Curated annotation (Swiss-Prot):
Keywords, in A-Z order: 4Fe-4S, ATP-binding, Cytoplasm, Iron, Iron-sulfur, Metal-binding, Nucleotide-binding
Names of required cofactors: [4Fe-4S] cluster
One GO term of the biological process aspect: iron-sulfur cluster assembly
InterPro entries membership: Mrp-like_CS, Mrp/NBP35_ATP-bd, NUBP2/Cfd1_eukaryotes, P-loop_NTPase, YlxH/NBP35
Protein encoded by which gene: CFD1
Location in or out of the cell: Cytoplasm
Family membership noted in the UniProt record: Belongs to the Mrp/NBP35 ATP-binding proteins family. NUBP2/CFD1 subfamily.
Molecular function GO terms recorded: 4 iron, 4 sulfur cluster binding; ATP binding; ATP hydrolysis activity; ATP-dependent FeS chaperone activity; iron-sulfur cluster binding; metal ion binding
Gene source species: Cryptococcus neoformans var. neoformans serotype D (strain JEC21 / ATCC MYA-565) (Filobasidiella neoformans)
UniProt protein name: Cytosolic Fe-S cluster assembly factor CFD1
Record note on quaternary structure: Heterotetramer of 2 NBP35 and 2 CFD1 chains.
Matches recorded under CDD domains: Mrp_NBP35
Function: Component of the cytosolic iron-sulfur (Fe/S) protein assembly (CIA) machinery. Required for maturation of extramitochondrial Fe-S proteins. The NBP35-CFD1 heterotetramer forms a Fe-S scaffold complex, mediating the de novo assembly of an Fe-S cluster and its transfer to target apoproteins.
Length: 331
């Protein structure tokens, strides 16, 4: 079995155990907030987990604001080993990379054609010093555009697993229950199949509104459409997430700097700048506040299902590689 083709991207990401690409067929379905919740839920699974979060929406970056890093102090540092992501917490367990950190004015628009976007995406993948990561979550723009093609082109060498490294990029789909959103989700699913990107499942977001007064659930955008589509298309259904007013208030507070306070973590040494951590479990305000929401409990179950599916996917790959090796040996 051939080894993974070595490229600047494959070398840089060799210390990343799992890559999860978050996709949606259309905008406004809560994909970016889902990416943030997935990252936080992965961190909550273990105090030693380290997660990276890439904002691949070049023309409309939103992750810095969602994690409380939309501040002048949140800037990308250059270390001896490459760009350094901006860390959300003192323990440097959650690092974020976004073009939003590179703009002189956070209100500036990014008017780029495909080739320039491709160059930035390549830099995000090959020049960011993540260190050892358990998970790298990549939040993509809605639809299927230049960004998606560039991403999968640069990740292509990682689609050739070996016995020593069965990790390949995987993805999840985010949709709301309405027919329009689901139709666009089918297009994203078709895209993943054409490019052989494994889909671990679908999340039905905004699936009901929980009244904060009486607790009654109203199916504002319909119900069950995502689950029905997932079953029909043979895609795992990971769960449905209702609208959580507490989460909305939390994200608003985070964007105003009322949760993190000081904002981005300052890098005081080259070791710290390169993302090294001693595995400490220091105070993590954003994670602590998030775990108080109803959404965190829903995403806990979704994340566990996703992790189980990823591990099964890797196990299946190893089994196929072993079977192939045995066949070649007999021949």
């Amino acid at each position: 079995m051939a080894d993974i083709i070595e490229t600047p991207v494959s070398r840089r990401l060799s210390t990343v155990k799992n890559i999860i690409i978050v996709l949606s067929g259309k905008g406004g379905v809560g994909k970016s907030s889902s990416s943030v919740q997935l990252a936080l839920s992965l961190l909550a699974q273990s105090p030693t987990n380290r997660v990276g979060l890439i904002d691949l929406d070049i023309t409309g970056p939103s992750l810095p604001r969602m994690v409380g890093l939309d501040t002048p102090t949140a800037t990308v540092h250059q270390s001896s080993a490459g760009w350094v992501p901006v860390y959300v917490d003192q323990g440097r367990r959650l690092g974020v990379m976004s073009i939003g950190f590179l703009l002189k004015d956070r209100g500036d628009s990014v008017v780029w054609r495909g080739p320039k976007k491709d160059g930035m995406i390549r830099q995000f993948l090959s020049e960011v010093r993540w260190g050892d990561l358990d998970y790298l979550v990549i939040d993509t723009p809605p639809g299927t555009s230049d960004e998606h093609i560039s991403l999968l082109t640069h990740l292509h060498p990682l689609f050739t697993p070996t016995m020593s490294n069965a990790t390949t990029p995987t993805s999840i789909l985010i949709s709301t229950p309405q027919t329009t959103a689901l139709n666009d989700t089918l297009k994203s699913l078709s895209f993943t199949r054409k490019l052989s990107l494994p889909v671990m499942g679908l999340v039905e977001n905004m699936a009901g509104y929980v009244c904060p007064c009486c607790g009654e659930i109203s199916d504002t955008f319909g119900k069950g459409g995502g689950e029905a589509m997932a079953h029909k298309e043979g895609v795992g259904f990971l769960g449905r997430v209702p609208i959580d007013t507490v989460l909305v208030s939390l994200l608003d507070a985070v964007s105003k700097g009322e949760v993190l306070g000081e904002g981005a973590v300052e890098h005081t040494s080259d070791e710290a700048a390169e993302g090294q951590t001693n595995g400490s479990t220091e105070h993590f305000p954003l994670l602590d506040k998030y775990l108080e929401t109803t959404s965190s409990k829903v995403w806990k179950d979704i994340t566990q299902k996703l992790v189980d599916k990823i591990e099964q996917h890797k196990s299946d790959i190893r089994a196929r590689l072993e079977s192939s090796s045995e066949t070649l040996a007999i021949a």
